Amino acid sequence: MINPTKVDVQIKEFSKEQLIDISKDIHKQGVAVFYNQKLNETEYTSVMKKFGECETPNLFMNPKEHPEIFLVTGKKVDGKKIGMFGDTELGWHSNGNSRHLIDKILIALYCVKEDINTTLSVCN
């Protein structure tokens, strides 16, 4: 079982060099959890770009202003899904379906609104 250390820091204040060091630790440990981050979409993508290049496939679940973000939600606007996956349990996962094309990958999740049903499981 992975038991990440709970550290109360704001990653948006880290330099690129500090984030690269963190990514090396993530590679060894398998996961890092940063609680209580106060990031808007621009700050989130700025931090992620310090780690490396972000994927921007421009699909329906990628906001036009921030195509690096993938919305994982069952929420609908005007009757249309705005994010990937279903209306109930989302069951979101990344199984590295394109890992054979790349030599490094980092997945970052940011929970905007947590509730009693919010669960994060990490398997490596």
Where are these regions (language model features)?
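Non-heme Fe(II) oxygenase catalytic core, chiefly the N-lobe of the double-stranded beta-helix
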Residues: 1-124
